[in-house]
């Protein structure tokens, strides 16, 4: 399945779960946990085969949920949008080891993405390791990940 299709399914599932949460919807921490878990599962599914891939999905989902919940507790929609756009730009165009920053002038939250090693995985996809750092309310948190291009360039 293409990465874009997976992302759309995750977004749809997240919005449906928010609707089930009652008046006011899910809070930022709940949304962060849900999206972090889904994103972690998606990243974990890129590694291994058979049972190894299932382990990757499980570990990715767990780590993503924990980190997503912590980060989501303090990030608002504008923070998430800025972080997402910055991540995409950093992974596509920035040299390894450089920081690509974002800053929300409304609340002072900020962060940066540091793209690292570029490599080809076992299925021939081009992938890139990265570090994402966010500072929310003066508290810094880091996440590490890998992002891979799909055959269609997405």
UniProtKB/Swiss-Prot annotation:
Looking at the record's lineage, which domain of life comes first? Bacteria
Pfam name, any one: 17kDa_Anti_2
Would the keyword Signal be found if you checked this record's keyword annotation?
yes
- Name the residues where the record annotates lipidation as N-palmitoyl cysteine: 20
Membrane association type: Lipid-anchor
Compartments in which it is found: Cell outer membrane
Give residues with lipid attachment (S-diacylglycerol cysteine).
20
Q: What is this protein called?
A: 17 kDa surface antigen
What lineage is on file?
A: Bacteria, Pseudomonadati, Pseudomonadota, Alphaproteobacteria, Rickettsiales
């Amino acid at each position: 399945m293409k990465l874009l299709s997976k992302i759309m399914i995750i977004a749809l599932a997240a919005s449906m779960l928010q609707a089930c949460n009652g008046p006011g919807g899910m809070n930022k921490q709940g949304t962060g946990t849900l999206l972090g878990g889904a994103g972690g599962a998606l990243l974990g599914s890129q590694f291994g085969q058979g049972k190894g891939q299932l382990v990757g999905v499980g570990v990715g989902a767990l780590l993503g949920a924990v980190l997503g919940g912590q980060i989501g507790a303090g990030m608002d929609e504008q923070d998430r949008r800025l972080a997402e756009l910055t991540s995409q730009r950093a992974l596509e165009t920035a040299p390894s080891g450089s920081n690509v920053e974002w800053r929300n002038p409304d609340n002072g939250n900020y962060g940066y993405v540091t793209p690292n090693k570029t490599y080809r995985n076992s299925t021939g996809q081009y992938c890139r390791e990265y570090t994402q750092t966010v500072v929310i309310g003066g508290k810094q948190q880091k996440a590490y990940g890998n992002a891979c291009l799909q055959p269609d360039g997405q």
